[in-house]
């Protein structure tokens, strides 16, 4: 700590910049704090540095700090040389190099598998792309074959249209138990001449028509008079009947009633 008291404010600021220690203006109240930070930094570096290079690499000449032109040469910290020294001598101390991107420990060999792990997804993406193209081709071929089959099919009448719609519609429990079928029969060439009296067309029409009549029933329910309106109409009608009854009774009970 006494070595730093000899330094001027400019020299102390140069040391702080060289050590990458954030600082402000050096005043009488802040000088002791900056000297303490420099002392702690150098103590940590001596503890983490190898014993052989502690006297050579980290020796600083504080007596030759008169000229400001040689500040960078006097306080040069060989960070790259320290890294090479740690890698050559295989030191496993917890010495970290902090940067804005990564934090890496010196002395640990760089993993070669990282490049492989980044290359593998590329091959997997290529394989996935190939399989996707094959699936698209298969879908195109299958769709073209289905279109060809649809063109070969004959044009059905109205009854067959009901059957084609109903082949995806399950029969109700009553009709399934009576007919012993799980689904409606599929349309085929034998059903071209089917008439309206066939059971399949009758069942399909019966299954489709209630769905069409459901909106009309809902509209009819919406148009009905609400309950409170019905009660008001009933009370008005009862009042009218009572008025008629009392008027008749008054005419019959009056003996002096004379017809005009």
UniProtKB/Swiss-Prot annotation:
Annotated protein name in UniProt: Emerin
Q: Which organism is it from?
A: Rattus norvegicus (Rat)
| Record flagged with keyword ATP-binding | no
Q: Where is the stretch described as Interaction with CTNNB1?
A: 169-188
* Chain residue ranges for the region called Disordered: 184-206
Its membrane topology is listed as: Single-pass membrane protein
One Pfam family recorded for the sequence: LEM
**Predominant cellular place of this UniProt entry's protein:** nucleus
A cellular-component GO term for this protein: microtubule
Its gene is: Emd
Enumerate the transmembrane spans: 225-245
